[in-house]
UniProtKB/Swiss-Prot annotation:
GO molecular function per UniProt: zinc ion binding
Organism: Mesocricetus auratus (Golden hamster)
Cross-referenced Gene3D superfamilies: Metallothionein Isoform II
Protein name: Metallothionein-2
Gene transcribed to yield this protein: MT2
Modified residues (Phosphoserine): S58
């Protein structure tokens, strides 16, 4: 499995919960693809970008 678990823009996240992806720009998060982006993130559809130095993504902060 790709450790970066990159998702294409407008793609759908199907990464495992243990995946620590660095570039998650999915419009639909089926799971907590990024550790900083929880499943219940209502703004996930706007395009989350995980930052390695932060526990929260730009849209869920």
């Amino acid at each position: 499995m790709d450790p970066n678990c990159s998702c294409a823009t407008d793609g759908s996240c199907s990464c495992s919960g243990s995946c620590k992806c660095k570039e998650c720009k999915c419009t639909t998060c089926k799971k907590s693809c990024c550790s900083c982006c929880p499943v219940g993130c209502a703004k996930c559809s706007q395009g989350c970008v995980c930052k390695e130095a932060s526990e929260k993504c730009s849209c869920c902060a």
